[in-house]
């Protein structure tokens, strides 16, 4: 069973409109959805209206939330300060995948495994995993 850590941009995009393609993550079988309060709050503050925030709150009820501990970044990994809590929380949640659309900061790590976590875009994961 895959444990998927959803980055803030995935949460934001899923909540942005009621027909968002990323809602497919909530219909996948044999997965556990994970994220962090940090990512959830980042998504929430970037959503512009109450309907979007309401969708985000409903989606969040089906996600296990984790926080990063004060551990160090893995050797050789360079991320901006604001993105470090995402990877660290994914590590603490013992996820199998970090799902992110952040090409700028996580792009160099796409397709690579860090501390047992495969970094992929939403489309990369969904290509090989079908909803129920």
Regions flagged by a language model, labelled:
Residues 13-15, 46, 109, 128-129:
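Residues that scaffold the ATP/ADP-binding catalytic core of kinase and kinase-like folds
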Residues 77, 104-132:
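Acidic, PIN/NYN-like endoribonuclease modules and their adjacent C-terminal/linker elements
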Residues 1-35:
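Short, well-structured N-terminal submotif of metal-dependent ribonuclease cores
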């Amino acid at each position: 069973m895959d444990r998927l850590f959803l980055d803030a941009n995935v949460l934001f995009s899923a909540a942005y409109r009621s027909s968002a393609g990323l809602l497919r993550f909530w219909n996948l079988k044999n997965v556990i959805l994970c994220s962090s309060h940090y990512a959830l709050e980042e998504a929430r503050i970037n959503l512009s209206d109450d309907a979007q925030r309401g969708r985000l709150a409903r989606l969040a009820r089906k996600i296990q939330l984790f926080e990063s501990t004060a551990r160090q970044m893995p050797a050789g990994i360079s991320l901006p300060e604001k993105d470090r809590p995402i990877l660290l929380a994914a590590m603490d949640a013992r996820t199998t995948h970090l799902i992110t659309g952040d090409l700028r900061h996580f792009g160099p790590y796409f397709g690579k495994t860090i501390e047992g976590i495969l970094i992929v875009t939403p489309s990369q994961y969904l290509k090989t995993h079908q909803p129920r």
